[in-house]
A protein has these predicted regions:
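Phosphate/diphosphate ligand-binding glycine-rich loop within oxidoreductases
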Residues: 34-40, 47-159, 276
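C-terminal helix-to-coil terminal segments
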Residues: 287-317
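Rossmann-like adenosine-cofactor binding region
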Residues: 212-291
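Positively charged, low-complexity intrinsically disordered leader regions
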Residues: 1-52, 56
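Phosphate-coordination loops involved in phosphoryl transfer and adenosine-cofactor binding
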Residues: 33-39, 166-168, 266
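A short helix->loop->beta-strand "cap" motif at the edges of active sites that frequently abuts
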Residues: 134-136, 197, 262-268
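Glycine-rich phosphate/diphosphate-binding loop of Rossmann-like nucleotide-binding domains
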Residues: 44-66, 159-235
């Protein structure tokens, strides 16, 4: 595996889930693969679960992990080509990336959407430069449009808790005071479609995801109707794709609470975290026995470790 951005990079999902079960049962069984190997985790944006789970996954595999927080610990980096660097950016990615690559065996990169230019964000210009110029395997730790480590962890969690072969999974938009990227819902939709779940997206008008990510998912404007008979509810805010980066609604009736959960088939509640309580979801729901947010977060170590393990195995070939 040379890169991990999309569900296609992981290959057969049944095999990936089986590998995840093995990793979860015996997390230290592959430490020989990571001996004398180093991963550098590059963060352009804040992180809690992604940073810690990636470091833990690397340690489980016997690797050294170096974390670089770009905006607080290094030179400010220019990301666009062809610019005159007469501002506050001291170094260009074109030089920084191969330097970083020379210090490690694989790289993880977190770089959120800027919401300034949809084409720039959806072309994944920053992480694509890491893939092109580093000469090393690259993992998306959430880029402008995708968060594959999160989506893989979500799939692992659903696989662990599902009570039927093809559960009904609902991705529900929920209100938030800030404009949030589409990376998490994009990846969740992409992975649920690939897993052939009974998958429904419910969101207000103007919040449809990009077609390449929504795929064949049914889109339902009526949240209550979408929730009927659901086995898993995944709540998440995202800004508009059509009116790029804009907040079109803060309708609190979309907050996931007991009223909505009552029409499900005793569904589990999921969220990637961090979550705005009583905006995205009520205390009653997130603190209930049906809430999976903590085991879901714990599976971030498992998903990251499967990906890193495969990359290490590729280095040994």
């Amino acid at each position: 595996m040379k890169q991990f951005l999309n569900v296609s990079d992981i290959g057969d999902l049944k095999q990936a889930l089986q590998e995840a079960r093995q990793v979860k049962q015996t997390p230290f069984a592959w430490q020989h693969l990571g001996k004398n190997k180093t991963i550098i985790l590059v963060f352009f944006n804040s992180s809690l679960r992604t940073r810690l789970s990636s470091q833990k996954a690397a340690m489980n595999l016997g690797m050294n992990a170096i974390v670089l927080n770009i905006n607080g610990e290094s030179w400010k980096l220019e990301t666009e080509m062809g610019v005159v660097m007469d501002g506050d950016k001291s170094e260009h990615l074109r030089e920084a990336i191969p330097v970083i690559g020379s210090y490690c065996d694989m790289i993880g990169v977190r770089s959120f959407a800027k919401f300034e230019d949809r084409d720039f964000d959806y072309n994944e210009n920053i992480i694509r430069q890491f893939i092109e110029y580093s000469g090393k395997p690259v993992i998306s730790l959430e880029s402008a449009t995708v968060h594959p480590c999160q989506a893989f962890a979500d799939l692992i969690t659903i696989d662990e808790y599902k009570k039927k072969d093809r559960p009904k999974v609902v991705l529900s938009w929920a209100p938030h005071p800030k404009a949030l990227p589409q990376a998490v819902p994009n990846s969740f939709a992409q992975w649920m479609n690939a897993a052939d779940a009974d998958f429904v997206i419910t969101c207000p008008e103007g919040y449809d995801l990009a077609p390449e990510f929504a795929g064949s998912a049914k889109v339902e404007r009526d949240q209550m109707k979408a929730f009927e008979g659901a086995d898993f509810i995944y709540a998440k805010n995202w800004a508009s794709y059509e009116h790029y980066g804009q907040i079109l609604s803060k309708d609190m009736s979309w907050t996931v609470g007991a009223r909505q959960m009552a029409v499900t088939d005793n569904a589990y509640f999921m969220h990637c975290l961090p979550v705005r309580r009583n905006m995205i979801v009520t205390d009653e729901v997130i603190d209930s026995p049906q809430s999976l947010v903590i085991p879901e977060a714990a599976n971030r170590v498992v998903s990251a470790q499967v990906v890193m393990k495969r990359m290490l195995e590729g280095l040994c070939l």
